[in-house]
Amino acid sequence: MASGGALSPVEEKPTVVKTTKAEQHEEEAAVAVKSAAEMMKKSSPCCPRCNSIKTKFCYYNNYSMAQPRYFCRECRRYWTQGGSLRNVPVGGGCRKSKRSSASSASASAASPPAPAVGAAPPVVPALSSAISKLLQSEPMAAPCADFPNVLPTFVSTGFELPAAAGDRLSLGSFGAFGNLSAAVAAPGGGGGSSTTTSFMDMLRGVGGLFDGVGNSHQMGGNGGGGGSYYAPLITGAGNGMLMPPPPLPPFSGSLMQHGMQGLFANHAMGGGGGGVMNAGEDGSVMAGLGGGQWPPALGGADEQQGGGDGGEAVMTKDTGGGASSSASRPDYFYGWNSAAGGVVAGGGIGGNAAAATGATPWQGLIDSSSAMM
């Protein structure tokens, strides 16, 4: 022992961290891969097929850095480094093929030619024949079926309808007035004459509404002369008349039927003396007919007096005056012309205050028909 009892210090050994072999191999592999990748990127390998240097790196096959894949621009083929070469023809990597072009050419040849733009489609013969028959067929005649609805329009337009291109259409253009032109062009004789075409002339040509008419404005001779069924109401003016009721169409509702009866049957249109159906000079209403004949007895106690009463019924005698004036008549009991008389002129010479008013012709008829609609 050394003297003095001093102890020597213990020397400490440095600790060395030992790594496992697996870790060492991993580090080495990573360094090798990095170096190989850098070399591949820096230098392009030659193509194993054509030995061309025009190659490029594409990607890693199967995401493995040990299998880089290249592409040769010269022969247009791919290869993988370290793998086997496939027997791929030149240009095998190109997706353009002759099969697609051939199929497109055959499809274009097989497609039918497009129709011309201006060519019209073929017309079916059956359809064309049906259309021609429909155009040639005449409409069914229904005279005065819509008379209350059509009359105000005809009156407001002067009994004419406007058409395109500035033309005027008369009532003869419609199917319900088919025989209109013949009736107006060839009026009958007897009782009087007129050079103008009136609305009653037009109505005479419609489906037998005024059959047996003598000629325009006057229907028969003086006082029932000429054997006409519809005798004139006055002597001298020659344009008063009694409108007979036409066959009523099947309207629904009693208001329309009552209006049609009141429009055509219940009252007379006239301007002066002379009986409605004269059998002589007494001027009674139903003197020439007897009982049970058409037209039936007109309504009202003062309108149903028999023959021989002196003609003081609807129209008074030629020398009478004012017995049946407008005091008990509705608006549509009127004279044919406003100048010939107002609502009802009581006699050929007499007349009352209503005759001097000069009411507009057809105004009352228009008001009544409008009220029925």
UniProtKB/Swiss-Prot annotation:
What is the predominant subcellular site recorded for this chain? Answer: nucleus
What is the stated purpose of this protein? Transcriptional activator that binds specifically to the DNA consensus core sequence 5'-AAAG-3' also known as prolamin box. Can activate the expression of genes encoding for the seed storage proteins glutelin, prolamin and globulin. Functions synergistically with RISBZ/BZIP58 to positively regulate quantitatively many seed storage proteins. Functions synergistically with RISBZ1/BZIP58 to positively regulate some metabolic enzymes, such as alanine aminotransferase and pyruvate phosphate dikinase, that are expressed in developing seeds.
The entry describes its oligomerization and partners as:
Interacts with RISBZ1/BZIP58.
Q: What is the name attached to this protein's record?
A: Dof zinc finger protein 3
Q: Which GO terms describe its molecular function?
A: DNA binding; DNA-binding transcription factor activity; zinc ion binding
Question: What Pfam families would the database entry show?
Answer: Zn_ribbon_Dof
What species was this sequence derived from?
Oryza sativa subsp. japonica (Rice)
UniProt KW keywords? DNA-binding, Germination, Metal-binding, Nucleus, Transcription, Transcription regulation, Zinc, Zinc-finger
Residue ranges, compositional bias (Basic and acidic residues): 10-23
Provide the residue span(s) of the region labelled Disordered. 1-23, 297-327
Say yes or no: keyword Zinc present.
yes
